[in-house]
Amino acid sequence: MLKFICYPKCTTCQKARKWLDENNIEYEFRDIKTENPTLEELSAWYKLSGLPLRKFFNTSGLLYKSMELKTKLPNMTDEEMLALLATDGMLVKRPLAIGEDFVLVGFKEAEWVEKLK
């Protein structure tokens, strides 16, 4: 079953959840703030996604900005970035939709249609 990981107060997450419901796609819901992704999960999702690791960061979030990660990330290794992401779910871009052979980061409807319909 599809894993849907989001922050319920996030409007983009709300749109994605509505889209899943309207398209009758079953999913397992997980609140990223109360159940932070583990280092192991993040590593697996990163490898499965084929995306640059920076795409997993919530660059518009307050925590990202207050930690000045825009200037720090270029000097960090993948291992350091994954460990940092695992410290707080609010650093992670959301929503995440995780299937057997794919990971969708953020809600871009065209990408979701391609993978989920």
Where are the predicted features?
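Thiol/selenol-based redox catalytic cores and closely related redox-interacting motifs
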Residues: 34-117
